[in-house]
């Protein structure tokens, strides 16, 4: 029986997604205008946010760009926000978009060096606990200077490299052969080709390392003003420079960092929350053989490429630490330097570098349209006003918790931006003192960065990982990410809130003032045009 036009429409709509998912998205598109016009724009706004979170949670059923984009287009069409407000949000976050377009592509051209370094780390260090700690620490260090997305892009590149090497050899091919590592584990006769238990164990091992690395980016990213995009925004509003930002954050970030590393050790030691997966001996042997094979066939030309990439890595860290240009422009310089000095001049070879990041860049632009709805419908206004009604230490704790809860379900760049703007308005209105504003800025920054590891919605790096080509290969779903992040979420959130609650933040800040490590700022300084560079 031939397919009817309506069946063809449903079949084409959102492609291979499950039928129930397609019906859910169509239902959302019907419900939203009814809620907006006949119930309340405020209710419709929150429903839209929840629907968008649903599309993110179902990222493995359907990439969120299409369903989320349809919801966003409808929101603009019915007047929940305007196209100009969406454009304003994209303009305000241009650095984040440039970061995604250029920095992630730049890292693609440095992956030989990164694969070299991390392969040595995994082949030379046999202890799983030690490898986990190394990945967590390396990610934390890198993300203090690079954006967390950049670091996760690095780790994803490394993991895909490991997975494809194993898949290629286990499928009976040599290292140099072409091979599709995304194919199912069957040969031409339809028989299983790969050892299923071995493959599952290796997937578990890679999942563990990626989650440790992901949390590592949060641990390091909260410490410096270049660690996360929202840190830049908060530092600019408070007129803090690189050193002052790190010092002011340290009463919260140092205890949290220590607790995070201890959590990494404990979950691996006791094999809880899905951790403790070991690297099978057979896989370890393949990776060691590959390492030896690569070392043996490495020519002077190849060695020169690694040296050039190492120098570019130094420029990358120095350029970001000293804030010599915006993050995206430094990423563009990395692309130019890496391709020019390593002889990559073919347009098609350049194009491959952008494949990973551009769908996510488009998704982020769609997310900014949801942010525009949140602003136009003032969805967060009641929470912010309630928090400002409290005083002193209680106010700091409330802002930390309120930031944390909203960052778990919303983009932390947005949450941080909204809160720091509201608090700055309160400062200029005389509701709070300048010293209280500085403490609130610390609470907002740490509250935005730390509890948001709970879900991929809060951490852009986690969302990038979830929607990457690697996630389905290693069976890393939304639910599994939330479960594996849970011990970190609990520990980081509690240690962070305790550092504020017991007065440690206030006492240490006073100590820094007394020892002249930092100086008191005036309200007048907050009126000066904010500069992030």
UniProtKB/Swiss-Prot annotation:
UniProt KW Transmembrane helix keyword: yes
Stated family: Belongs to the NhaB Na(+)/H(+) (TC 2.A.34) antiporter family.
Spans traversing the lipid bilayer: 10-30, 67-87, 96-116, 131-165, 209-229, 247-267, 310-330, 355-375, 396-416, 454-474, 485-505
Origin species: Shewanella oneidensis (strain ATCC 700550 / JCM 31522 / CIP 106686 / LMG 19005 / NCIMB 14063 / MR-1)
This protein's encoding gene: nhaB
Purpose of the protein: Na(+)/H(+) antiporter that extrudes sodium in exchange for external protons.
A GO term, aspect molecular function: sodium:proton antiporter activity
InterPro entries, A to Z: Na+/H+_antiporter_NhaB
Major site of localization recorded for this protein: membrane
Protein name, as recorded: Na(+)/H(+) antiporter NhaB
Membrane topology: Multi-pass membrane protein
Keywords: Antiport, Cell inner membrane, Cell membrane, Ion transport, Membrane, Sodium, Sodium transport, Transmembrane, Transmembrane helix, Transport
GO terms under cellular component: plasma membrane
A Pfam family hit: NhaB
Top-rank taxon, per record: Bacteria
């Amino acid at each position: 029986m031939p397919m009817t036009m309506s069946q063809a429409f449903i079949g084409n709509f959102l492609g291979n997604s499950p039928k129930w998912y397609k019906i859910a998205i169509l239902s959302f598109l019907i419900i939203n205008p009814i809620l907006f016009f006949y119930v309340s724009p405020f209710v419709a706004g929150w429903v839209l946010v929840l629907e968008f979170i649903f599309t993110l949670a179902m990222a493995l059923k359907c990439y969120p760009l299409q369903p989320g984009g349809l919801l966003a287009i409808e929101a603009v069409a019915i007047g929940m926000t305007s196209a100009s407000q969406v454009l304003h949000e994209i303009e305000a976050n241009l650095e984040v978009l440039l970061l995604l377009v250029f920095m992630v592509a730049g890292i693609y051209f440095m992956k030989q060096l990164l694969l070299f370094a991390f392969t040595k780390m995994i082949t030379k260090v046999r202890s799983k606990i030690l490898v986990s700690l190394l990945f967590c620490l390396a990610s934390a260090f890198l993300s203090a200077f690079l954006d967390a997305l950049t670091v996760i892009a690095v780790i994803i590149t490394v993991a895909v490299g490991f997975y494809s090497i194993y898949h290629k050899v286990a499928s009976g091919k040599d290292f140099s052969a072409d091979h599709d590592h995304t194919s199912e584990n069957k040969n031409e006769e339809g028989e299983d080709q790969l050892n299923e238990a071995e493959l599952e164990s290796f997937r578990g091992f890679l999942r563990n390392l990626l989650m440790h690395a992901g949390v590592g980016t949060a641990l390091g990213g909260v410490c410096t003003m270049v660690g996360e995009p929202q840190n830049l925004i908060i530092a600019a509003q408070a007129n803090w420079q690189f050193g002052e930002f790190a010092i002011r954050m340290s009463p919260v970030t140092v205890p949290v960092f220590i607790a995070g590393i201890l959590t990494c050790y404990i979950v691996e030691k006791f094999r809880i929350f899905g951790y403790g997966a070991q690297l099978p001996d057979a896989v370890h042997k393949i990776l060691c053989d590959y390492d030896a094979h690569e070392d043996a066939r490495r020519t002077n030309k190849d060695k020169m490429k690694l040296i050039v990439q190492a120098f570019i890595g130094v420029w990358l860290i120095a350029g970001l630490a000293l804030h010599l240009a915006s993050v995206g422009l430094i990423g563009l310089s990395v692309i130019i330097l890496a391709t020019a000095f390593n002889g990559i001049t073919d347009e098609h070879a350049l194009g491959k570098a952008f494949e990973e990041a551009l769908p996510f860049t488009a998704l982020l632009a769609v997310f900014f349209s949801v942010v525009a709805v949140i602003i136009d419908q003032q969805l967060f206004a009641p929470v912010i006003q309630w928090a400002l009604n409290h005083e002193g230490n209680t106010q700091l704790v409330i802002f930390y918790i309120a930031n944390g809860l909203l960052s778990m379900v919303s983009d932390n760049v947005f949450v941080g931006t909204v809160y720091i703007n509201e608090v700055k308005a309160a400062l200029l209105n005389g509701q709070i003192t300048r010293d209280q504003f500085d403490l609130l800025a610390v609470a907002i920054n740490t509250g935005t960065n730390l509890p948001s590891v709970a879900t991929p919605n809060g951490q852009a790096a986690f969302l990038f990982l979830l929607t990457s080509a690697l996630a389905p290969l290693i069976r890393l779903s939304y639910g599994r990410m939330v479960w594996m992040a849970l011990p970190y979420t609990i520990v980081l959130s509690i240690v962070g809130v305790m550092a504020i609650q017991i007065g440690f933040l206030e006492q240490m800040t006073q100590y820094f003032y007394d020892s002249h490590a930092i100086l008191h700022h005036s309200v007048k300084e907050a009126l000066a045009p904010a500069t992030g560079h």
